[in-house]
Amino acid sequence: MATFGEALEALEEFRAELVNLQMNATVPQAQAMAFRATAGQAGDTPLANVHATGVGIRDDGQFVVKVYMFDAASVQSAASVSLFSAPMQGVNVDVEHLPVQVAFDRGTARKAAAAAAGNPAQHQARRRPVPGGVEIGPLGGNFVGTLGCFVRRGGDDNGPLFVLSNNHVLANVNRFPAGTPFTQPFSASAADTIATLSSFEPILFPAPGSQPRNVIDAAIAVVTDPAQVVTGRMLNIKKYTPQLMAPRPGMTVTKAGRTTGVTNGMIRAIRVRGVQVNYGTRQNPIIATFDNAITITGNGGLPFSNPGDSGSVILDKASGRPVALLFAGDGSTTTACDVSVACARFNVHPV
């Protein structure tokens, strides 16, 4: 059985061979790596449908190279490509269906019945003092997300307190200016304001001659009145330890989110390169590509997240330490970014 390190080495070799195959295939590489919005897939062959790869884990604890395809039908025909059917440096290769992910920023509580055990109503209510894992939205706006956790600047325990969440929650996908007020819960009343937008990492989208990659969907907002919030706490999570931790395939995780409340799941893969995320609508998709992503599935066949849970900080369940920042999904798989990378971007640490 391969070790985690061996799986990482095999992943890099696999990616190199995949690029060579795609360049030499009859389907042009540009088409193979692009999302064809009208069809919901990149092409008509297994090679053309690969859009992401990472290192993951099977239920038996075996580390594997993960290959993600747009089209479920192509997963069935993947065995026709030797690269997908044979081990890479002794590490098995698993091919799975992963559709285009959707940025989870709208507050429609879909599948609420399935998530009722997570007490979602408590996470949508007004809370004072405000903990992590609750509803947040722009003052008088038309969407909501989740307040992930509170953070401070590195080494400054007496400095300003910030909210950590997603760009598409706090900055409305690069649109909001600094100083935009946010309320808890979503409200049209300025009296419910708890923070104002401070900074965000821009989300990059394709343009003629440019195919940029993203690694985080993250932003911070400065807390307006620290007396109105409580640090070191996630609503309905018993163990929260505000110390960053590296994610790992097979890790049991938990999160508190605005729509599904507290849910539990498992990290299926990390260092996933090439995940396609839709920041538009189904009819008018606006696709951004993410590298170094993390994929998670919920326990017991339940969704780990739903729209409105974006911005949730995902914790290692055993230690309560933050490992990821939730930002997208498809109803079955949740996609997150490494929260350590997000914190480093803003020079902050959880508190």
Question: What kind of feature is each model-predicted range?
Answer:
Residues A115-A293, T297-G298, P307, L315-R321, ...:
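Serine endopeptidase catalytic core focused on the charge-relay Asp
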Residues L325-L326, P350:
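Peptidoglycan cell-wall recognition and remodeling modules
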Residues V75-M88, G232-L244, C337-A344:
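Surface-exposed flexible segments
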Residues L147, A336-V351:
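C-terminal, disordered and strongly charge-biased linear tails with low hydrophobicity
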